[in-house]
Structures are given as structure tokens and as C-alpha cells.
Amino acid sequence: MAQPLVKKDDDHDDELEYSPFMGIEKGAVLQEARVFNDPQVDPRRCSQVITKLLYLLNQGESFTKVEATEVFFSVTKLFQSKDTGLRRMVYLIIKELSPSSDEVIIVTSSLMKDMNSKIDMYRANAIRVLCRIIDGTLLTQIERYLKQAIVDKNPVVSSAALVSGLHLLKTNPEIVKRWSNEVQEGIQSRSALVQFHALALLHQIRQNDRLAVSKLVGSLTRGSVRSPLAQCLLIRYTSQVIRDMANHGQSGERPFYEFLESCLRHKAEMVILEAARAITELDGVTSRELTPAITVLQLFLSSPRPVLRFAAVRTLNKVAMTHPMAVTNCNIDMESLISDQNRSIATLAITTLLKTGNESSVERLMKQITNFMSDIADEFKIVVVDAIRSLCVKFPLKYRSLMTFLSNILREEGGFEYKRAIVDSIVTIIRDIPDAKESGLLHLCEFIEDCEFTYLSTQILHFLGIEGPNTSDPSKYIRYIYNRVHLENATVRAAAVSTLAKFGFMVESLKPRITVLLKRCIYDSDDEVRDRATLYLSVLGGDGTVDTDKESKDFLFGSLEVPLVNMETSLKNYEPSEEAFDINSVPKEVKSQPLAEKKAQGKKPTGLGAPPAAPASGFDGYERLLSSIPEFAAFGKLFKSSLPVELTEAETEYAVNVVKHIFDSHVVFQYNCTNTIPEQLLERVNVIVDASEAEEFSEVTSKALNSLPYDSPGQAFVVFEKPAGVPAVGKFSNTLTFVVKEVDPSTGEAEDDGVEDEYQLEDLEVVAGDYMVKVGVSNFRNAWESMDEEDERVDEYGLGQRESLGEAVKAVMDLLGMQTCEGTETIPLNARSHTCLLSGVYIGNVKVLVRAQFGMDSSKDIAMKLTVRAEDVSVAEAIHEIVASG
């Protein structure tokens, strides 16, 4: 029997709730299933048993083949019953049991009979079940019935056939594709649900044919879709067509944009919201295109229905990330939502306001946030904290009030992710705003006095060791750090010892005090703490052994000469023996990431994130990789890493691509190599680079790849020196050289002797755009006016004849390698003039803004007026030189 499940409630402590599934066991239910074999079927009792079986299956309970077969055969006997409710339960259990092909035959005749029944409910459910359990052979036998069902007058039957088609398309696409004519008729149905399912199926059938999808969208946008659900689907497909056309180089006015805009005037709210969302998510959407969508969303902000308010404010929140100025007109409406009873709406409203508000509204917003922070879940609090971090970077003069708010909520209750978000925000503020350093560090010190998370304590201690010694009074942090040695677990104590040592080395006046504290630590109960204390005392000279400053600095602050991931792997593989572990045996090359990892979407960087296990393919990953190689350590800070450039054709014996790493006076070519031949091992893999067409470059060094086994990517490097700060360009010829050794497939061992060989790669170019990092600005006009007008340089250029204005704009964008702003990369159809706004950071970390005005005459000759402003006038002149020579 079901057991009572007591549920506590603040207002009704005496209420009881009963769960009908409490205490259900598979064995007992299988015994009950014998009721299916009774001569006189009890529909109510049988339905209860089937419900229990469905519950067990959905809870992940596994049935053996014998158990499933027995239940299946017993259930088939229930087709004798005429009870409608029981018949529906029979359909469900057959679908869930998924009988094998030899068992399906037994139930097929019953289902076929139901599929041709006069009862529409039987027909619809029989179609759904049959399509779930049959294979391709049986499908061809019932295909005629399914086609008839698609165009059936009863919408329930028609929808069942269409939804079944969606499932069958995954396993039998060739058969389903033959139903296009019937599905096309379904789109003309007067039933909203049938039209919705028909459109979904027809799109799935044609999804791999870009032209067919475009034609489908074009035919339906003329007004033949009446179902709001189908209209929402059509809006999504239209957005995809617009994106595809943009990706394939079509410039000018967006196709189908007028359709999206017309949907904003639809009578169904779901269609209006879908259209508004689609417009806001268009690539490179302009302010003009956004305006009608923003206007509609603003009206929904004052809707009495919470779901509409939530949908509108969530969409506006996303828009505010890329086009904050477009959302400012909604600020008054969103301020009224801060006190909304729905905390999700209030959270989205406040975070949107934080992104769009001005400096004068910060104080008022912070007071309003304080009032509701305790009422929302941690996941929403994290969103608020992230918005505050962005706001502080945007308005650095307001750091005091924002830092105070963060420190207050840091002392409140909360989970690990929430606390980490706050700590990361404070760290970001400290790094970006020098004036905030001391107050921020003190807030972090107070937090670790009562921090329950070991990870956060160790990360904060590490950060204190880096930033604390450089403050005006480093001694005030010593008490907080040393308290951790007495009051925390071994991991935190070890981190505190390391932090103390850094203070002792960096601040000469503190060295005697630090030495005394470290001597106390050598009696700690944990061997890691004792070992660290002993080691640091030796480094600091506490035992009479004084290393040089350089050696001490390298030890305390330097990085290992080998990648951490390789060190970790080598230590795991090390087997204790009389021979000590040799760090020189750790390989210095880092394997390239698999393609799937490279494509994965990364999370945004945080202030105190743990280092990843392997270098990422992004800028930070490249920077870590290069800094781990001793030969490159003296090149300074990495300025830019390019996207990989393929140097081989697809499906060749060896796959090679190159990444260009730009330093102030060096360029490092990172050749990512993959051996695709299982029977070969490549050794001494190197790239010979001919720089005869790159006169300003001179080769400095190269780093070969010792071994390249099958399907195990590796990296070779070649370094060139160039004039410091100069955007030198040139073409490089590349030849891959290596020693080939045959591999025995049975043993996997390579032969001792190899043959030297080489493989010609494609040429590589270093262009002017490699010296520019794309960095956008949220408000181009303000950024432009903030730069000194005296550093402006203007000139005019003739770009010759072009097919279109868009071609000329793209050529200039590619040449300069800058980020387009405010959607100016989109050019109206048949436009004769256009202004493109560009921003970026030039080598040497110099901010650059460009206003390029294009004009085209009747003969398609294009002229350009280029206005450049930069923090350094010489950079503005360099941009003009690039254009003049390009």
C-alpha cells in the first residue's frame, strides 16, 4: 500500500500528502502484472499496474529480456478489452517496452486494426506506437496508411502521423522524404497544430538544401501561415535563412527583414515576442533595425501578465550586452519592475539597468538592489554580481560604492559559485582600478577570516602574495595571513606559508618578522606545511643559506619550464624507485587540443579561475604555452595570436596549420602538425622557412618536434625577429622535414632505422592586420570625442572599380583587421555611399578609431575618405600608410 509522505508547510503543519508510488518494488509489480492474464479483464486494476510499470521504467529501472517479454505478451492480451482508458495505457506501455523485431510482429496486426478503426483516438495512438516500434521493412508496408493519415480530416490523426514522421526521419529518412506532397498539404490545414507539425517536418526534410529552405520560407512569408505556433517556427527558419545568406557573402538590405518586422504587429503575443527576439539576435543588427523590436518589448514591460514581462525584460537584457544605448528608452519602465513580485523579473530588470544606466544613477540602483538581494536564489545573485563587475569597469569613479556593496554581500550566506563570483568581481576591480587595490585587498582579508571554502581561501592567499607586497603598507596583511596558519586546514595553511614567503622576499623590512613566523611553521602537524616553511626559510636566508635575488625571485614567482599538464602526467606515470624523478624527462611540447574541444564554447574569464588542465586554443592558452617555453620567455608580453591558417589540403598524409603569435619585436610561427598515417612514426619534425620575400624578418631560432606518432598532434616553432613596434609584412615559404619510421601494426613498435623526407606546405603571409586586435567600443561617438582631435589624420583614397560598395568595405576591414562598430558592416541595398566605424588596439597597446566614408559613382569607381584617431599620432599615420600601400 502507498505510505503517507509527510510534507512540512509553514502554514499547514498538519497536512499530509500521499504518493501513490511510495515503496514500489519491481518484483512485486511484476507479480501484479499477472492480472493481465485473467479471463475477465479488470480495466481499472490493469491500468493501475501499467501505471506502476511506466513509473519504474521512467525511473530508470531495467527489465531483463525475459521480464520485458513476459510483460509484453501479457499486455497484448488487453487488446481484447473495449475500455478506452485501458487501451490508451496499453499504447503507452508498448512504446516504453520497445519490443524486439520478432515480438513486434505479434502486436502489429492489432495496431494495424486500430489504425484503420473508426475511433479517431485509436487511429492516432496506433500510428504513434507503430512508428516507434517498427523497422524499415514494416514501415514500407504501412507507408500508404501513413500518407493517408497525414491528409486526414481529423487534426488529431493528422498530427499523430506528422509527429511520427519527425521521429522516423532520424532512422528512415529516404522513406519520409517521399511524403513531401502530403506534408505540403498539411501546411495548408486549418488546424493550428497540424500546420505547426507539418511545417516542422517539411523543414526537417529540406534542412540540408539551403536553396529549398529559402524557397520554403519565401513562399510561406507571403501570409499562408495562420497558426501562431507555425508562425513562430517560420520566424526561426527565416532568421536562419538571413544568417546563411550573410555567411555566404550577400551584402545590402537583409532579405525577409520586412517579414520579421510585420510579425511585430501580429495579434498573437507569442509571435510578437518571437519576432522581436529574432530581430535582436540578427548578426550585426543596426539601431534602425532594432527600434521597432525595442518599442514592442517596451510595451510588454507594462503588461499585467508576468510571463510577458519576463520574456520582454529577458530579451532586453540580452540586447543591452551589445547595444546598451538602444535600450535606454526602456529604463523608466524597467525601474518600475525592480519591485516586481516575481524576483526573476526584478533581477533581470536590475541587471539590464546596470548595463544601460549612466553614472549618476549608480547610487540609486545600488540602494534598490540591496533591498531584494536576500530574496533571490544564488543563480540570480550571480547574474547581479556579474553586472556590477561590468558596471564598475564602465564607471571606475564609482568603485567605492560598488566595492562596499560587494563586500557586504560577501559576508552574507551563500553557496560556493555565488561567493566565487563576488571574489572574482573584487579581484577584477582591483586589477582594473589601481585606487581600489588596498580597500579591495582588505575586504578579501576579512572574508578569509571566516571562509568555509578551501578553494577560495587558497586563491585569495595566492592573490594577496602577488598584490599585497606592492601596497603602501604591506605589513597590515600579515596578521590575516598568519591567522590562517593557526585556524585552517592543511591546504590553506600551506598556501598561507607560501604567501608569507612572498611578502618576506618582496618587502625587505618585513623579512625578519616573516622569518620568525616561518620558523614557527616548521613544527606544523602537516608535512606539506613543514616542507614549505623549511624551503622558504632556506630561500630567504633564515638558516644562513642565502640565494641570489634572481634565483629567489625565479623560485617564488617564476613559472616551470614545462607545461603543468605534462608535469602532472609524468608524475602520475612515475613509479617509485631508487632513481629520483627527473624533471628534465618531462616533455616540453603540449599536444594540440582535439577539434571538438576547440569548437566548444568557453565561459567568460573570471578573476580567480583555476588554471585549466591544458592550454586553451584562445589567447590565454597560447600565452601560457609560449611562456612555458624557455626560448620564448624573453620576448615580452604576447600581443596577438591569429586564427589557425591551414597549410595543407584536407585528407592529405600530414595535416599542418599555423598560428602567428605577434610580439613587439618577434613573430613566432606555431606549426600544429598531425600524422594521419597509422603505419608511420615521424621523428625530428621541423619546418624550414624561407623568408626571402620577407626582407624585414630574420630567423632567430626554431624548435623541432621530437616525435609525431599517428593521430597525436604536436607543435613545432619557428621564431623571426623584426624591427620593434613596426608592422613588418612578408611572405614565407614552408617545408616540413622529418624522419619516417615504419610501424609494425601488430605490435605498434617502430623500426630503428628511418628515412629522411620532406613535405611542401602552402605559403604563409604576415599582413598588416596581424598587428591589430579587434576591440569594440559600446559608444563610438563618446570614444571618438574622448580622443584628442590633434591626433587625428585624414586622407582620401581611390579604391578603383568594384562590383559593389560592400566589396570595398570588406576589403578595407580585412586590410586593417579592426572591429566594426554599431552594425556599420551592414550596407543598405543599392547604396551609393556608406560610413563604416572601426575600432581596435594597435601593436604597442595603442587604441585606434577609424571613420571610413565610402562613395561610388555611376561607373562603380569607389572613393574613400579615411579619418583616423589614435592615442599616438604616429599610429594614426601608420594606419594611413597601411591603406596607401594596401
From Swiss-Prot:
Subunit structure: Oligomeric complex that consists of at least the alpha, beta, beta', gamma, delta, epsilon and zeta subunits.
Stretches for region Disordered: 592-613
Coiled-coil intervals, chain numbering: none
Function: The coatomer is a cytosolic protein complex that binds to dilysine motifs and reversibly associates with Golgi non-clathrin-coated vesicles, which further mediate biosynthetic protein transport from the ER, via the Golgi up to the trans Golgi network. Coatomer complex is required for budding from Golgi membranes, and is essential for the retrograde Golgi-to-ER transport of dilysine-tagged proteins.
Stored InterPro entries: ARM-like, ARM-type_fold, Clathrin/coatomer_adapt-like_N, Clathrin_app_Ig-like_sf, Coatomer/calthrin_app_sub_C, Coatomer_g_Cpla, Coatomer_gsu, Coatomer_gsu_app_Ig-like_dom
PANTHER family (alphabetical): COATOMER SUBUNIT GAMMA, COATOMER SUBUNIT GAMMA-2
Bridged cysteine pairs (disulfide): none
One Pfam family of this chain: Coatomer_g_Cpla
Keyword Repeat: yes
Compartment(s) where it occurs, according to its Swiss-Prot or TrEMBL record: Cytoplasm; Golgi apparatus membrane; Cytoplasmic vesicle, COPI-coated vesicle membrane
HEAT repeat windows: 66-103, 288-325, 327-359, 360-397, 472-509
Protein name: Coatomer subunit gamma
Entry keyword Repeat: yes
Family stated for the protein in its record: Belongs to the COPG family.
GO terms under cellular component: chloroplast; COPI vesicle coat; Golgi membrane; plasma membrane; plasmodesma
Gene Ontology molecular functions: structural molecule activity
Phylogenetic lineage: Eukaryota, Viridiplantae, Streptophyta, Embryophyta, Tracheophyta
